[in-house]
UniProtKB/Swiss-Prot annotation:
Disulfide bonds: none annotated. This is Satellite RNA 48 kDa protein. InterPro entries: SatRNA_48. Belongs to the nepovirus satellite RNA 48 kDa protein family. Residues 1-29 are annotated as: Disordered. Residues 1-27 have a biased composition (Basic residues). It comes from the Viruses. It holds the Pfam family SatRNA_48.
Amino acid sequence: MQKTMTRHLSRNRKPHEKVSHVPRRGPRTYQDPCDPGWCVVNSCRRVAPQPIPTSGSLGRKPLNPGCPSRKWTEKIIAAPKHGFYSAKDHGYWVPKVKVQKKYNPLQKVVGGGKSYKDVLTTPATIQIKPTPESILLAQKIQNSTFKSRGKVTLSQEKIPLVNRFQELLIEKELMEEIEESQPFVANDPRAQHLICKKVPRKVGRREILVCPITNDESHLNLKSGIRAEIVDSMGSVVHAEKIAEYNRGHVVKSMRKRIVYERESKPIPIIGSFSDRAIRVSCDDHTDELASASSVPSEWKPSKNQRAVPCLLQNESGTVVSTKPDWYTPVKVCTHKQYMKVQRVFLDAMNIMRALRFHIDSKTLRETWVKCWLQVHKKNVAFPGWMIAPLLSGTVPCEQEFLLPRVNETRAFVTTCYA
């Protein structure tokens, strides 16, 4: 009956006739819902909640998403892995997730089975129900640039255990009055321009750049773009209006047509003024090197070979053990993502240290801080100046020491200049 009806309806229509229906296929068949097969999700997808009509029929009610309207047979249909939309069920058919088998303890067999020794020697499988904190912490550990090789251990009796996911309760009278000593939070306006990519939005006829998170207009002029120069092997940017300042006190490398000219050293600006990079590396001919955590005073680190004697290039081969200091190693140029990662770890570490500031004596704190950075530096990423300056000054940083630029500021990373 169905078939003949369909055939009758789908005769060749004359051009002026409206198409009143879509010829249906026969009923489609799916796997049994109890098997790991298909099930309907987000059933009854309506764009807006429709008003319930007061009179007349209520229309077809959406079917229960658990048991979709199909004649279940053993046939398996051909469908893409991600599922497909079914208008009849108002929802997507998706492959069912494999159900985890319930654990059934093995029945003891008198003859075979595990001996006590087997039981004791096999590792125990423990399942811990993850809490949001533990998940966050696990992710942080996975993503962190620290490796377990040289653990930074803090002595337990000195430091209270700090749950980083709760705010520390510290007595207010101990807190220093610092303008920006609040720790960084998600979408912190102080770091917005470091993190978010500006999005062009049309306002009238003008197109302006807008921060997608805070929605405020960028200070950049879209037509002329950003006027800035890349100044070192890290790809650090100095904005045009700061270039003079940068040139006043810094080693500059200019690369044109693949010729590396000699860098010229410029006189140092007055102490106390700000400049775009905190570190001055007085270097002769090594093109890409940066001061690193290794430039901290030697009493804070294990005394290895302190003499910084660069190897001669001819000398360098697999057999010769080089006595180069670790800052001599040419720096890998890291991607923006890696750089953001280092920056994230850095800010985290900084905030932890700042929180512990009142609980430990300064020496331990300083040592811990430096150890952290020696760890990160093993990954051989280049640090921009604002990260290293606090290390060189040998103190745990506070905001006066590296001034992260504010929301609408054009300057690149800025730090107090300790000449």
